[in-house]
Amino acid sequence: MNYKAHYIGGRWIEGQGESITKFSPIDQQVLWQANSADASQVRAACHAAREAFYAWSHLPASERIKVIQTFAALLNEEKETLARVISQETSKPLWETRTEIQSMIGKAAISIEAWEQRTGESETIMPDGRALLRHRPHGVMAVFGPYNFPGHLPNGHIIPALIAGNTLVFKPSELTPMTAEETVKLWEKAGLPAGVLNLVQGARSTGTALLEDKQIDGVLFTGSANTGFHFHRMLGGQPEKMLALEMGGNNALIVDAYDDIDAAVYTIVQSAFISAGQRCTCARRLLVKNGAHGDAVIKRLVEVTERIVPSHWDAQPQPFIGGVISLQAVQNLLEAQDRLQKLGGISLVSLEQCQPQSTLLTPGIIDVSQVADVPDEEYFGPLLMLMRYDTFDEALAIANNTRFGLATGLISPDAALFQRLSEDARAGIVNWNKPLTGASSKAPFGGIGASGNYRPSAYYAADYCAWPMASLVADELTLPETLAPGLHFPD
């Protein structure tokens, strides 16, 4: 089966590359199949974006914003349809994908506000003229989308980039082609001019062709650290290309004494297991204080975790989690659990595959407190490592003992401890008595170290979608009353 899965220069076309197939995570039924875009089609997409750039970037910003607002309105009309598409190909429950669509809709207004506040135009009056600050789009930008939020996360790059006046080539994850296709159809319906947004579907070869294309002025990426590092190496020695990397994390959640144990456990579960552990901000390491209170927290956490039953995305009543993205992801997580056990980790709740040929996994908790060298890896799924500590200094040292730096958090009634954490944590997101997976659309989103390259997204996405232009201007040119030393203008 091959059909028109790529949108280039305002036309839907068939791919000329290798065949790609999307399987249902739940039962491995074929959901989607097409040929990927080959290198020549990627070049055509980049050329179409370049051809469309001048007209799009020279439109008044108000006209570009009208298209974005129309897209948001169409999203609202089609929100249930798109939520079901996302659920189908990710296996996330409908309750969660519905919230993803709402985030996509809200991104329009918040991005317009951020563009005005962070990259709009300003003027300062000076004694002999004016100082102007304006912002200009980069040009043609490549957007690489992840599979865990196939609607919301690419949308968080696409909308700010379009508002700024850029044109785009979008390469989604090959694991979520349907969401990308349906989203681009809404952009087309919204009246986005031909060539402004182009879609190329495919796997590694398609992505490599896009990264290597000389027409690309910038790359916006959300995904794994390994892939992000690969992108960084490929673009090494090309400082003229803007690169924004939002990668993963080996995030630590510190639990201090807290009277309401159930509230603490609820926050832990929301931090570690929501989206089947497939959020980049999910807690990977749980740090619990030694003592009777910590023991009680762990006992209750085990009880609650054992009762989490993954199920089909449209099951009634709705499950807390569905499956992970693929059978390969299942295998990777089971192997990770096995490696940790061989290192001396003790499984308190075993991560298990619910049935063959399904990606439904029961969440796992493994105590690695006695493991000498815990691997500094992001296990992207419902596998939580438990570590015990005695003092807050020790907990802080453990939390910071990672090459990543995306998120960390604290469950504690003690504001002074949070103050210390916020001063000393090496992370871009630091939460207190809130899930690690919670974030504000009015704040930047990103990390340091192996979690990113200091190009946070969300409210700060406007920053990497445009470059500043500073100007000194005067309406008239006059000879100054006092000349520079050594200059003479004879009568």
Curated annotation (Swiss-Prot):
Catalysed reactions, semicolon-separated: N-succinyl-L-glutamate 5-semialdehyde + NAD(+) + H2O = N-succinyl-L-glutamate + NADH + 2 H(+)
GO-annotated molecular function: succinylglutamate-semialdehyde dehydrogenase activity
Active site: 246, 280
GO biological processes: arginine catabolic process to glutamate; arginine catabolic process to succinate
Entry coiled-coil feature ranges: none
EC number(s) recorded for this UniProt protein: 1.2.1.71
Gene3D superfamilies named in the record: Aldehyde Dehydrogenase, Chain A, domain 1, Aldehyde Dehydrogenase, Chain A, domain 2
Pathway field: Amino-acid degradation; L-arginine degradation via AST pathway; L-glutamate and succinate from L-arginine: step 4/5
UniProt cross-references to InterPro entries, sorted A to Z: Ald_DH/histidinol_DH (IPR016161), Ald_DH_C (IPR016163), Ald_DH_CS_CYS (IPR016160), Ald_DH_CS_GLU (IPR029510), Ald_DH_N (IPR016162), Aldehyde_DH_dom (IPR015590), Aldehyde_DH_Superfamily (IPR050740), SuccinylGlu_semiald_DH_AstD (IPR017649)
Domain of life where this protein originates: Bacteria
The entry's keywords: Arginine metabolism, NAD, Oxidoreductase
Keyword presence, Metal-binding: no
Binding site for NAD(+): 223-228
Enzyme class, UniProt record, top EC level: oxidoreductase
Presence of the UniProt keyword Oxidoreductase in the record: yes
UniProt-listed SUPFAM superfamilies: ALDH-like
Family: Belongs to the aldehyde dehydrogenase family. AstD subfamily.
Function: Catalyzes the NAD-dependent reduction of succinylglutamate semialdehyde into succinylglutamate.
Protein's name according to its UniProt entry: N-succinylglutamate 5-semialdehyde dehydrogenase
Name of the encoding gene: astD
